[in-house]
Amino acid sequence: MQPYEKYLKLNSQKLRADQTDTERKLWQRINRDQLLGFRFNRQKPLLSYIVDFYCAKTKLIIELDGSQHYKPDYQEKDALRDAELNSLGFTVMRFSNDEVMREIEAVVEQIYLFLENVRTD
């Protein structure tokens, strides 16, 4: 189990209860071990963050980015966060909300290919 800041637990529970349409759409495709038997958690506290989706077995983090993530200050924060997580052995995959809503098959395919590669290593 990965460590996390305890104060994040309540926030993550609220986020799970109020998931966005985009999060719901992807969750329907990756929950219940649907992708090669890998289990995902949603709105998972991890270190000092809450990540959208997390697969502990592969240390894969999936983030869904709304329009606010394309503003310079958010891009900088996301880059620092991703760099910290990558330095600790996590892989971060980012998809825009538009990608998930319009091209869900392509998004799931990218996740599947990553998991397949990890599984064969």
From Swiss-Prot:
Pfam families: DUF559 (PF04480). It comes from the Bacteria. To E.coli YcjD and H.influenzae HI_1162. This is Uncharacterized protein HI_0925. It comes from Haemophilus influenzae (strain ATCC 51907 / DSM 11121 / KW20 / Rd).
